[in-house]
Amino acid sequence: MDYFSESIKKAIRTVPDWPKPGVSFRDITTVLQDKTAFRKLIDAFVHRYHGQHIDAVAAVDARGFIIGSALAYELNASLVLVRKKGKLPFDTLVEDYELEYGTASVELHEDAFKPGDKVILVDDLIATGGTMLAATRLIRRIGAEIVEVAAMIDLPDLGGSRKLQEEGLQVYTVCSFEGD
């Protein structure tokens, strides 16, 4: 996967000191705007999951929707949206998670999966892992099987991937940015 990883990593714009001093923001819009880079990104995921008979791609609000919809289409899988609380119109399951200063919640329609469905959970980036971990709890409550948690970018210094692995989850990221 080095072919995909290096070219995608180079296409990601780093914005220093945004949204606050000391933060290096990883801007994925440059990947999305570059049709070759975006194709390579989706191909990286498709090559990984092709032939695994994935039933659904669960995509995390909001940038995960971009990657998740393209991946679901390519895998001939359904697309399930993991939304911020209050955004889904039908009966939902809700899971709270900790933020640096407070809590947040994600939700899922209670009929989003069938028990035993094979699911890939996708987002743009793994930082602390809180949102992804909350989403995995929702998916498991419905009885679906999480094949893997996947993202374009890993920020390993923030510990999210490690936290997800400690919960017994397989984690795949296309590229990572350490220490900066």
Swiss-Prot record:
Its main location: cytoplasm. Transmembrane segments: none annotated. Keywords: Cytoplasm, Glycosyltransferase, Purine salvage, Transferase. InterPro entries: Ade_phspho_trans, Adenine_PRTase, PRibTrfase_dom, PRTase-like. One of its GO terms (molecular function) is adenine phosphoribosyltransferase activity. The keyword Transferase applies. Gene3D superfamilies: 3.40.50.2020. Its EC number is 2.4.2.7. It is an enzyme of class 2 (transferase). It is found in: Cytoplasm. Pathway: Purine metabolism; AMP biosynthesis via salvage pathway; AMP from adenine: step 1/1. It holds the Pfam family Pribosyltran. One of its GO terms (cellular component) is cytoplasm. Belongs to the purine/pyrimidine phosphoribosyltransferase family. Homodimer. Catalyzes a salvage reaction resulting in the formation of AMP, that is energically less costly than de novo synthesis. HAMAP family: Aden_phosphoribosyltr (MF_00004). This is Adenine phosphoribosyltransferase.
